């Protein structure tokens, strides 16, 4: 799939072909049909919201569910969905000090031994 990738702060986004991994038990794979880059994405781009790079921006999207993890019961393949891919717990130190993009809540993170969610096609 194509993605708007931020590789460096204060640099233009690069449209790249990326591959996605299979969804973990509580994840959903969505084939994006439309996405927008909003003001919060600009905060990532200018470094106001620190976040590990590279990062895919355009977190508000609409699409079709392609696959679901084993524990997902609220959507199924073929469902049309809208998304906001921001995930944070709201109670850790990062969240309470306004740095939700750094939330480290284990329930919201992919385990270190799991493959990356995204890979550039020529780097996969």
Question: Which stretches of residues belong to each language-model region?
Answer:
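Charged, glycine/proline-rich intrinsically disordered loops and linkers
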Residues: 109-124
């Amino acid at each position: 799939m194509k993605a708007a990738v931020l590789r460096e702060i204060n640099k233009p986004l690069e449209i790249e072909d990326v591959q996605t991994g299979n969804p973990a038990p509580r994840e959903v794979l969505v084939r994006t049909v439309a996405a927008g880059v909003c003001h919060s994405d600009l905060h990532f781009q200018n470094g106001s919201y620190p976040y590990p790079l590279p990062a895919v921006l355009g977190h508000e999207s609409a699409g079709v569910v392609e696959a679901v993890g084993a524990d997902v019961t609220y959507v199924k393949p073929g469902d049309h969905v809208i998304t906001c891919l921001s995930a944070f717990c709201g109670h850790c130190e990062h969240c309470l000090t306004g740095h939700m993009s750094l939330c480290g809540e284990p329930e919201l993170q992919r385990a270190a031994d799991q493959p990356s969610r995204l890979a550039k096609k020529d780097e996969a």
